[in-house]
């Protein structure tokens, strides 16, 4: 998933995004 898509530890995100443990959706990866 990309920005705002739901995710979890077993469901990754698009390149450049990471799964937020807090909100359980994809957010921009930090530096």
Curated annotation (Swiss-Prot):
Keywords: Disulfide bond, Ion channel impairing toxin, Knottin, Secreted, Toxin. This is U2-theraphotoxin-Hhn1a. The presence of a 'disulfide through disulfide knot' structurally defines this protein as a knottin. The keyword Disulfide bond applies. It is found in: Secreted. One of its GO terms (cellular component) is extracellular region. Agglutinates erythrocytes. Transmembrane segments: none annotated. Disulfide bonds join 2-14, 7-19, 13-26. The keyword Secreted applies. It comes from Cyriopagopus hainanus. Belongs to the neurotoxin 10 (Hwtx-1) family. 51 (Hntx-8) subfamily. Hntx-8 sub-subfamily. One of its GO terms (molecular function) is toxin activity. Expressed by the venom gland.
